[in-house]
Amino acid sequence: GDVKALLSQPGTADCDVIFGPLYTHQVKPLGDFCKQHDIRLVVPFSINGSDVCYNTNIYQVYQNPDEQNNAAIKAFLERFPNHHPVFIDCNDSTSKKGAFTFALRNQLQLAKRDYSITNLNNSEQMFLKAFSRTKPNIVILNTGRSPELNVAIAKLNGLVANVPGISISLFGYTEWLMYTKYQSANFHKFNTYIPTTFYYNAVNANTINLERSYSRWFGEPMQYAQPRFAITGYDHCQFFVRGIRHFGKNFCGYRSQQVKFPLQTPLSFERTFSPSKKEGGWQNKCYMLIHYMLDGGLES
């Protein structure tokens, strides 16, 4: 829709922060308005365009797929320097994970690190050949889908049963967080790492309290989704409103300026620059590796 009607409302120019817009074409007019009146514009949704690189008042939460892939690869290389990577081809013609696995393999080659490739349809004997007996193995599938994950875990369970002492961890995808209800035990068994920009913890006391309050306010539970959109909005609001109240004009959205611990969606902004190296706005760079530990614990 047209944002001009919103911008003409009394008091809008006096805001400290505006959350939105929903659509890419709304970013420029809203951004120009916010720059004119020195208002922070928070863009929480998936948009296209590079306005954030040219407007110092824009805070872009969304990280595009390339940025997320690069963050996941960086985290992988830092966390697993001594592991043997095993890529499993899951024969999923609909998968969009090829960009990630190709880029990761390329980085491993540049670092002169060995890795193996196997196929989900291989015999147990052929499947086993891809794994190291002397190093811990880190397994990467080339799909985020649940059916292929089920088959892979079944094959890995067979491997562990037949080869005592073999060490296997899984490196997954954000989609796997949707499967935790029935995969949690397997994630812990295989020391699983899931890269993500959010983590919904259903047993966190503060999360439970917010969900109860939400149901009381709106007469229905939060929408079942990963992430919980209501909690995303809550975290964003807490981050900016408390940050601005505490730091005033000095609030830039750095991780160190986080006043209240987020329930689900942490934020950490870094300054962007235009192609001509002129200062731009702020891009969220927060990224986590959720680790399902062998002892049943969780860490990030």
Task: Briefly describe each language-model feature range.
Residues G1-S300:
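Extracytosolic ligand-binding ectodomains
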